[in-house]
Amino acid sequence: MDTGKRLAEIWNESYISSLPSLVKDRGYMYADNVQRDVLITGFNPSFRDGEAVGALHGPIQTIWEEKKHDNYWSPVRKMLYDGNIDLRSRTDYLDIFYFREQDQHFLKDKILSNPNGIRFVVDQLNLTMHIIEDIVSPKLIIIKNKESWAYFGKFFDEKGWVWMGYKFEHIQNMECGELCRITGLLESKERIAPEIKQTNLIGAFVLFTKHINQYTSLSERPTPQILKDILNWYETEEIVRSLSI
């Protein structure tokens, strides 16, 4: 999957002209994703006045190693590195959507309310699912924004929302979120990537957290130790299964 090529195709679709002009004018932003054990997901890249527009991308490792404080990225970095444990080289990041806007209500109010907006959402989510499945293939996903939960299929039993359509097994509730495991894909014609017949992520852990920022209490933040323990759990199970005869 060539992420840049696919996004260029999406932004050149005829329906783009029917969406708010800022979608086309600002362009899109994406990470140069690679295979990693941990994947952190956000919602969509923000846009601040004066920032460059167009097709912007780069490796997430640059952000992981940045020392300068950032209201968004600094709390994320603290989940990965504490001086004793360093998960930065094992972690990738993506936003599930690629349009640039600061207002978290923009998608609901301006995109999903537009008949053509649904296709825009589906096309982006289809790309995102392929990146997760085919490129990153993580052992642990941290879904770091409650707004994103629905798009993974988390609320299917409660609301009937399918979108990417993962099936989850609840493992346990923790102060920093709900830990689940991927068990397969929903059998639904509404899945946004019907060409994906089986997931490569069976057994992968998913930690559903709230949106984490500088104001989030320490107890509600995943720590490097917690993430390392979950990874160790996954890897120990792999070792035990390899002994099966």
What are the functions of these language-model segments?
Residues 92, 96-122:
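Charged, often glycine-rich, active-site loop that binds/positions anionic groups
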Residues 51-67, 108-115, 162-169:
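A solvent-exposed, charged loop/short amphipathic helix patch at secondary-structure junctions
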